[in-house]
Amino acid sequence: MSTENALLTILVDRINNDTLVLPTLPEVVIKVRQAADNPDVNLMQMSDVIAHDPALSARMIKVANSAIMGRAVKVSNLHQAVTRIGLRQIKNIATAIAMEQLFVSNNELIKGYMGKAWHKTLHVASHSISLMEFYLKRNTHTSLNRDAITLASLVYNIGVLPILTEAERHPEVFANPSFLAHAIQRLSGKIGGSIMKAWEFPDVFVEVAQHWADVNHRTAEVSYIDFIR
């Protein structure tokens, strides 16, 4: 058995034995997502949830003042930011901010992979959302929606993270470009599905993370995975 295959075997064993370290969402993001799914939550209550994390609060204000919101008047506090962004978008923005923080590394090789993975995620998200907008204009009765494709495009490639994290923890063993490329190709889908299940995301996101790169995976009807590929 080659060294590369031996390393892959180690990773596969860790996946099968549930000993591979999976990334976790920050507690505040989990609370934001739960609050956003609560039909009784109002803007003030959402502001109170976000306020427990100063860094997230600052990022929300920055997003609210960004060009994408298209407003000339700047907001100066969290409640104004949440009001401008709206409850519908808060959940995905909080998740995106948390996701960006996961793609960091102190190892130069792994840092490069992390950066490429995150930029690829942003690229795919941009195209997927644009495709969905085009699709929705011509399919007004579909159950697919903008919020779900936004989230799906942010998490579709999450499976690369544990592989890169493992390489960072044991660079002398795993931090090899050839091995990493092979491991990501073979294992990231299965790992991605496991992460979505661990995060208790709906099945549509499990499908996207697990099968987006599997050309043999087909769905009976148009689904979010078709916009990611």
Residue ranges and their predicted role:
Residues 1-155, 162-169, 175-183, 187-229:
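Conserved alpha-helical "signature site"
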